[in-house]
Amino acid sequence: MAKEKFSRNKPHVNIGTIGHVDHGKTTLTAAISAVLSRRGLAELKDYDNIDNAPEEKERGITIATSHIEYETENRHYAHVDCPGHADYVKNMITGAAQMDGAILVVSAADGPMPQTREHILLSRQVGVPYIVVFMNKADMVDDAELLELVEMEIRELLSSYDFPGDDTPIISGSALQALEEAKAGQDGEWSKKILDLMAAVDDYIPTPARDTDKDFLMPIEDVFSISGRGTVVTGRIEKGVVKVGDTIEIVGIRDTQTTTVTGVEMFRKEMDQGEAGDNVGVLLRGTKKEDVERGMVLAKPKSITPHTDFEAEVYILNKDEGGRHTPFFNNYRPQFYVRTTDVTGAIKLAEGVEMVMPGDNVRITVSLIAPVALEEGTRFAIREGGRTVGSGVVSKIIK
């Protein structure tokens, strides 16, 4: 019945649960669904339904992920939860589930554990901008001082990875107790903690800028010459808006060029503007066909620059995923597929790392042989002879 009330007129935010194995991420996901469904704001999804996550393929990588949706008074949320630690790593690196913010679940009984740390680091590396903390299993800790200690520990850990630990909302509660209450048709103290958590998420995680409000960027897929009219480049607009008469830059592979948009077409029809998500042809003034190639991007002037060297967080496919069967070593030279093209690059491993095995998640430094339009958060595939052997995200630009 709750489904009828679902509306699309609230701002949309993507979030997910992260944290150490068995600290209660999936139970919390089920509890949020159960507590909100009593208010007609969610469809009830039970624990098993969320835990038996379907496997999906994203860029050839198998990832098990559960997606649920729910609403608060103010917003509509899409929430992802992964059953296994490896699924989180893959999810965050491939961007299969882009998160505008995350709920970090920490057991009050155990405090932060190795994967707690790893998920915070990954969030920092792949650009999850905001974290709200749910200190779970508070019903198992009688000592208020112990709860305070765990909270301090979490704040210090967040600060050590450049998140604002002192200002991060931390809500303590029990996902299991809240789930039991909701199942019994009651609204008790534990359910209130879930509502407190959602109020903190509403309040602390900002509504992301819509893609159309961001700076214009369009990866070039193809280039045509139209006699008497000039050069047309085609592609799907990644973000922003482009209008006839706009000054834009062509960035990547060669020196940056500046030109003016003299036409925007979609399905062979002339348009005044194209926006994020549109597949368009853009007519460029005074640009020769041989000056432009696939792999370059059209962008708002000064919004993105070409780079060759960067640090990245990568996941290397295992052999069951169609990846390599053998490890690779320092100076390995695969192709990096960024947006629409492959560029060869050399990989430098971190100090003390001898080799990388299929299935590993590592931080690497890359030097490309040609500059490509890059920024922190740009995602790429690592390929060898046309097959994908890894997936990564730029965590820091070097030059």
UniProtKB/Swiss-Prot annotation:
Domain of life according to the entry: Bacteria
Residues covered by region (G4): 136-139
Keyword tRNA processing carried by entry: no
Localization annotation: Cytoplasm
GO molecular function annotation: GTP binding; GTPase activity; translation elongation factor activity
GO cellular component: cytosol
Domain tr-type G span(s) in chain numbering: 10-209
Region of interest (G3), residue spans: 81-84
Region (G1): 19-26
Residues at which GTP binds: 19-26, 81-85, 136-139
This protein's UniProt keywords: Cytoplasm, Elongation factor, GTP-binding, Hydrolase, Magnesium, Metal-binding, Nucleotide-binding, Protein biosynthesis
Pfam families (alphabetical): GTP_EFTU (PF00009), GTP_EFTU_D2 (PF03144), GTP_EFTU_D3 (PF03143)
Positions with a binding annotation for Mg(2+): 26
Coiled coil: none
EC numbers on record: 3.6.5.3
Catalysed transformations (reactions): GTP + H2O = GDP + phosphate + H(+)
Region (G5) residue spans: 174-176
Family assignment from sequence similarity: Belongs to the TRAFAC class translation factor GTPase superfamily. Classic translation factor GTPase family. EF-Tu/EF-1A subfamily.
Assembly behavior: Monomer.
Described purpose of this protein according to its UniProt entry: GTP hydrolase that promotes the GTP-dependent binding of aminoacyl-tRNA to the A-site of ribosomes during protein biosynthesis.
Protein's name according to its UniProt entry: Elongation factor Tu
Organism: Campylobacter lari (strain RM2100 / D67 / ATCC BAA-1060)
Lineage: Bacteria, Pseudomonadati, Campylobacterota, Epsilonproteobacteria, Campylobacterales
